[in-house]
Amino acid sequence: MSFRTIEWRDDSVIMIDQTRLPGEEVYNTYTDFKAVAEAIRGMVIRGAPAIGVAAAMGIALGARDIIADTHESFFRQLENVCDVMARTRPTAVNLFWAIERMKRVAEAGRDKPLDGIRQLLKEEAIRVEEEDLTICRNIGKWGATLIPEGATVLTHCNAGGLATAGYGTALGVIRAAHEAGKKIQVFADETRPWLQGARLTAWELVKEGIPATLISDNMAGFFMSRGEITCCVVGADRIAANGDTANKIGTYSVAVLAKENNIPFYVAAPISTLDLSLCDGGKIPIEERPAEEVTCIRGVDIAPAGVRVRNPAFDVTPARYISAIITENGIVRGDYRAGLRRIAGN
């Protein structure tokens, strides 16, 4: 990879600023947990796996800066750090998975000196990043088996290296197929209102030399109906026990169109994105973001002042529209409730 999404360096967190892409490749340095939380909230970093990594690193920064004379005081303040992280973005379950993982590590080290606990948290945050790279490569290897030679793959939003520690889930599948020598091309939905497809996915694909075509969101059905799309691959922010999947707003529309046109629709996500505590997607919390994201683009108003706006950041695709769910442990089809529990080791 020719870029790093996020890394721990010299007791700081370094992130590529995704709000500046594709025009500028800028890396920001964060030295306190509140700044990391704001970066997550402001979508400097986004994508469920990347948010999980950022949260873990933010907690490690917060733990480092806690001033405490007793373990009781330290753990009370650490809980506050975790609460700040938890309030950043409600839909991506990887955020809460990472927070709980860091809490367990701290609790397991409770008998150590405070500096020892801080060190454990730092090491765990780095481990979360390293594991994500391995997980995404495994997702890619499994998923590449579903991509035929000569395929044209449609993807929505950005589930690439920028949405993870650096390889990608949906784009990891595409990247792995490309690395295996398959001659494929990609259609990327622009993905309003944040334009993650236009700004981020297209940027990654061009950078990697993978043939890419950018389309607006309302063109997907047109190209499907003409037989120009072989399959669809998207990422996920939360997957319920029955396979219902929350992903970037507009994913549901793509899935329905794919079903209508008999096109396979695949979801690629790590096990950490599964939320088996939810029986179905109706229980997934959906983040609503500011109206300005819809009415303005790069500071330019594109709608009349005073118009009412709704801006849900995600929608839920029912499992019946999903052909398969690709994880690092394998591919699940059909009975998602049983298959996801099996592949998650539950």
Curated annotation (Swiss-Prot):
Pathway: Amino-acid biosynthesis; L-methionine biosynthesis via salvage pathway; L-methionine from S-methyl-5-thio-alpha-D-ribose 1-phosphate: step 1/6. PANTHER family: METHYLTHIORIBOSE-1-PHOSPHATE ISOMERASE. Keywords: Amino-acid biosynthesis, Isomerase, Methionine biosynthesis. It comes from the Bacteria. Its EC number is 5.3.1.23. One of its GO terms (molecular function) is S-methyl-5-thioribose-1-phosphate isomerase activity. The active site is at D237 (proton donor). It holds the Pfam family IF-2B. Disulfide bonds: none annotated. Substrate binds at R46, G47, A48, R89, Q196, N247, K248. The record marks C157 as: Transition state stabilizer. NCBIfam families: eIF-2B_rel, PRK05720.1, salvage_mtnA. It catalyses: 5-(methylsulfanyl)-alpha-D-ribose 1-phosphate = 5-(methylsulfanyl)-D-ribulose 1-phosphate. This is Methylthioribose-1-phosphate isomerase. Belongs to the eIF-2B alpha/beta/delta subunits family. MtnA subfamily. GO terms for biological process: L-methionine salvage from methylthioadenosine. Catalyzes the interconversion of methylthioribose-1-phosphate (MTR-1-P) into methylthioribulose-1-phosphate (MTRu-1-P). InterPro entries: IF-2B-related (IPR000649), IF-M1Pi (IPR005251), IF_2B-like_C (IPR042529), Initiation_fac_2B_a/b/d (IPR011559), M1Pi_N (IPR027363), NagB/RpiA_transferase-like (IPR037171). The lineage of its organism: Bacteria, Pseudomonadati, Thermodesulfobacteriota, Desulfuromonadia, Desulfuromonadales. The gene is mtnA.
